Amino acid sequence: MKHIISAYNFSRDELEDIFALTDKYSKNLNDTRKILSGKTISIAFFEPSTRTYLSFQKAIINLGGDVIGFSGEESTSVAKGENLADTIRMLNNYSDGIVMRHKYDGASRFASEISDIPVINAGDGKHEHPTQAVIDIYTINKHFNTIDGLVFALLGDLKYARTVNSLLRILTRFRPKLVYLISPQLLRARKEILDELNYPVKEVENPFEVINEVDVLYVTRIQKERFVDEMEYEKIKGSYIVSLDLANKMKKDSIILHPLPRVNEIDRKVDKTTKAKYFEQASYGVPVRMSILTKIYGE
């Protein structure tokens, strides 16, 4: 593996290797091999971040590497007008890899085409967030010991959420029984994404119609800024909150995931249920990203 730009960059075999590595790293985050010893990784975040930035930083340090970088472009030469290509060339001079987040779709792919060192996409616009998808499916596999045969429901903003695109794509490496796409018409998953998929999907608007069939409920935030009519947003927003009532209608062993941060799309009462796995999901950020870095640099 060199660049990680899309969820499609992972084969099933590679994902299963990452699952096994993550199991190991979860027990001991201090890897004795220190596969990044003597290496410097640049974390170049042109958008602010908390979890992704810090978990990559911690993963690199745990593997013996050094970290340089920034979160937010305000303090960089980008604020003075430097173009992305020049920034990437500069980072090639300073480091052995680039973990990059950018507001524009395709920015990570562009960077990989001019970079001599590995580029890892940590989120590019509304395009993809592939390492988050690996965290998602690792969490699912940890709970069910399989991905195959499960019924999924993705709920909320399915049009602009890059985590959704990566999850839909990474599921092509497995055999889900069915994926429900639950959203208002305005925020349905993009047709070009759905046309790529090799498993059955069904679009619905009311989560209560299908929630009793679901093994994995994946929730995303509905973005207020996409709506022209604020009253329409308020109406739709209230229809896509995971209430305790909705959670209680799910299967006994089902789980609820969220890539975080959340706003109000999951009722805080749901946090206390056994189905709420989103904080556990977030805790796997460091060991999963250690495993991905190991696949790139340690083999």
Curated annotation (Swiss-Prot):
Keywords associated with the record: Pyrimidine biosynthesis, Transferase
What are the transmembrane regions? none
- Which residues participate in L-aspartate binding? K80, R162, R221
Q: Does the keyword Transferase apply?
A: yes
Which BP terms does GO give this entry? 'de novo' pyrimidine nucleobase biosynthetic process; 'de novo' UMP biosynthetic process; amino acid metabolic process
- Enzyme Commission number, as recorded: 2.1.3.2
So where does carbamoyl phosphate get bound?
Answer: R51, T52, R101, H129, Q132, L260, P261
* Pathway noted in the entry: Pyrimidine metabolism; UMP biosynthesis via de novo pathway; (S)-dihydroorotate from bicarbonate: step 2/3
Enzymatic reactions: carbamoyl phosphate + L-aspartate = N-carbamoyl-L-aspartate + phosphate + H(+)
Q: Does the keyword Phosphoprotein apply?
A: no
Enzyme class per UniProt? transferase
Q: Which GO molecular function annotations are given, in alphabetical order?
A: amino acid binding; aspartate carbamoyltransferase activity
Its biological purpose is as follows: Catalyzes the condensation of carbamoyl phosphate and aspartate to form carbamoyl aspartate and inorganic phosphate, the committed step in the de novo pyrimidine nucleotide biosynthesis pathway.
How does it associate, per the subunit comment?
A: Heterooligomer of catalytic and regulatory chains.
> Which family does the record assign?
Belongs to the aspartate/ornithine carbamoyltransferase superfamily. ATCase family.
Please state what the protein is called: Aspartate carbamoyltransferase catalytic subunit
| Species name | Sulfolobus acidocaldarius (strain ATCC 33909 / DSM 639 / JCM 8929 / NBRC 15157 / NCIMB 11770)
At the highest ranks, the source species' classification is: Archaea, Thermoproteota, Thermoprotei, Sulfolobales, Sulfolobaceae
